[in-house]
A protein has these predicted regions:
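Class I S-adenosyl-L-methionine
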Residues: 48, 173-176, 180, 187-188
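A short, exposed loop/beta-hairpin motif centered on an aromatic-Gly-Thr core
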Residues: 66-70, 157-168
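Extended, polar beta-sheet/loop recognition surfaces of beta-rich domains
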Residues: 182-219
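Short helix-coil boundary/hinge micro-motifs
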Residues: 2-50, 59-72, 76-79
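Short, cationic Gly/His-enriched loop motifs
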Residues: 61-148, 152
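An aromatic-rich alpha-helical recognition segment common to small helix-rich domains
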Residues: 78, 140, 151, 164-178
Length: 219
């Protein structure tokens, strides 16, 4: 007799069991299938747990998860916290839920009620690669074809800002474009108070560096 097909279903509506506790997952079996169902909060919790366990695939594969900690006391606290958060029930145009984010606020190493929020992918992509990983300033790449420095900004898509003889001039173009990006996000998501606070901090960093003619090393 052949074994049952195993299926995982994610993103189901959160609910409590008869004892009043939030349900993380439940199993449904049919004659041919073994279905592991995860509530939305349950799936997010499993992702957090996997990212925070030392020596697990996430920490080995992605350096950004090295040393990341989970300070939620347990799943019940996390699931209850989710219900009260702005954006938890919001969806993208493609139907996907907004993402749980720990990086937009100050502490990028801890999943906690103080550091996490739910944000749209549009905001998340604006801050991809906003940390120095090489000798060039943020937003700057050397274009071997022209022998110049290319300024490039990321959002929902990459956008080239031009070619410059100086890496500093290319970085200045990136700074100015990033300011406009953040200002547009502030105007678009003006009801998300936590995100507004975090975006204003990013904007302050950029505007301070521009005023002081300084390089922005991390955003």
């Amino acid at each position: 007799m052949s074994s049952k097909k195993r299926i995982s279903v994610h993103g189901l509506e959160d609910f409590k069991d008869v004892s009043g506790k939030w349900v993380k997952s439940f199993i449904v079996t049919t004659p041919i299938e073994y279905i592991q169902n995860y509530t939305r909060a349950g799936g997010l919790w499993d992702n957090i747990q996997n990212r925070c366990r030392p020596n697990r695939a996430c920490q080995e594969r992605w350096k950004t998860y090295k040393g990341v900690l989970n300070s939620f006391s347990d799943f019940q606290e996390f699931a209850g916290w989710c219900q009260s958060q702005y954006g938890y029930f919001e969806r993208e145009d493609n139907g996907r839920f907004w993402s749980l984010d720990k990086d937009l606020r100050t502490d990028k190493r801890v999943y906690s009620p103080e550091s996490c929020m739910f944000i749209p992918n549009e905001v998340n992509t604006v801050f991809i690669n906003c940390k120095k990983f090489n000798d060039l300033p943020l937003g700057v790449y050397f274009d071997s074809n022209s022998g110049k420095f290319k300024a490039q900004i990321r959002g929902t898509a990459k956008r080239n800002l031009g070619l410059f003889w100086s890496d500093v001039d290319a970085h200045k173009a990136w700074q100015q474009a990033k300011v406009v990006q953040i200002q547009n996000l502030l105007a678009k998501y003006n009801e998300h108070l936590l995100m507004q606070e975090a975006l204003h901090l990013k904007l302050d960093i950029l505007q301070r560096d521009i005023a002081q003619n300084a390089i922005t090393n991390v955003l």
